[in-house]
Amino acid sequence: MRLSTLTQAVALITATLMLTACGDDSDVSTEIIDGTPPLLTTDSNFSSGYSAVAAVFVSGQVQDSGGIKSVTYTLNGRAPQSLTIDTNGYFNDRILLDLGENSIALAATDNAGNIMRSTKNMYLGDTVAAGGSHTAALHDGQLYGWGRNNYGQTGTAYTSTFTDTMGHPELPTLMNNAPKNLISIKFNQNHSLAIDNKGQVYSWGNDAYGQLGRGQSNRHSCVKSADCRLDISAIAGIDNAVMLAAGYNHNLVLTKDGSIWAFGANAQGQLGNNTAINSSIPVKVDFSASEGVGHIIQVVASSSSSYALDDKGQVWGWGSDASANLGRSQACDKANNCINITNKPVRINVIAQDLADSTAQRVEKEIITQLAAGKDHVLALTNKDSVYGWGLNASSQIGYNGIGFKNTVNAWASTITAPTKLPWFAGQEVRRVYANGNASYVLLDNVAANNSNTRASDGILYAWGMFGETDGKGKTSYENLNEPTNKLTSLKNIDNMTMGTMHLIAHEKPLNQNNGIPFKNGNLFTWGWSFEGSLGNENIAY
């Protein structure tokens, strides 16, 4: 806040005494030149790092006793755009991101022309990926893959197994037949997707349900006849892609204009095109009956359900509701057998006051800013760092249904039928939520250390739901964690992570060099079920 007192240390004051020639009479004039920029504050959503959402919600306040002229943002060096501020200096808006690298500069200008700037760098896309048992990472736009390869899903252009004498990618292997300009990758089960720097989508691996989106012809035979594609090739009909979502046998692609394209299995209506027919080519998700839908900024997919987040903070879902996936306060049982599938998007009311309000009304309002989906459960993160969950909870992936709770009066139900606020995150800085299979994770910043003399840490992962641990003899045991637990105490400073079905890969934020400039690349860490080389370590072969 800019103070108006003359003693303010940063104020530039020029005093000019003008004495008249008339005896002892004199006039004293003091000119105060305002050289102090306004105070600009933003919430934690405006921060550097990887983004799971194709927009950033920018909320904050600008203060200056001399008045505010404007608040603007500049995206990737383009012309400045204005943000609307109310009479108290509050602003709240969303900025759509480009695929890949983004630099956003906020500038608050007061009536004296002083400017306060805040610049953040964000990356829209995933540079690490994990599927059923295959894994990959991008380095300088090139694809490195490893792990299970029975459908050619790593990108080798051939199939292989761990017992082959040569050629199986048990360590990170450069896939020379992949495009050299990739920005984002997404895997699930035994298929793979990628986007290049022009927004073109590529696919390879298992195609038994048409989940590669490349039509019916020219398939290869891997496990069965005509069930895969070994070549990494483009999907026709989709331009300007910015995000991928990989379900178990279907996929979603979000484009720059907010459209969603879907392909693959559709028996539960998970393609959202008002049918229950599989499609091997992209079909557009039908929002024509979705009243009040905003610009879609995120897509996620589960086993047979699909979800979207719009720029109003509204959540939409379609497909299977067998485990209360759509959060409609009812589970599928004999009374409600879910024969009638939901094949078009429906609104999921996550927060009680979740309405399509105006920008001004949203300044103090809690809204959803990020989604994650596991096999049959969903997590939603808000701008207030709250996390909501619903759906399948048999493994305590929502919470309190694991060892010590399950089958007791204190246990949560095995199906959470409506979005429920999870009780563990008050006062925490939740940067990301993750889910796959029957497990959940959050990425926390500013985590206090046990030792009061040690500074707080960023990039700490907490897990709950199904979690496996391996002892010194190589034996792995699984337990269902009731609540978020820091099981990975050696991991810190993580800036992105991807969950496979039962294994994970995380990227460490690059450390600074002596000159303060970050190294270009951080370390990669893998853990979980090691099968066919999925962890990228040749000494692990279970």
Segments and roles (model prediction):
Residues 111-117:
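Short, exposed coil/turn segments at beta-strand boundaries within extracellular/luminal domains
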Residues 46-54:
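Short, solvent-exposed loop/linker segments at the N-terminal edge
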Residues 58-62:
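Aromatic/hydrophobic beta-strand junction motif of beta-rich domains
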Residues 94-101:
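Surface-exposed, short loops/turns at beta-strand junctions within beta-sandwich domains
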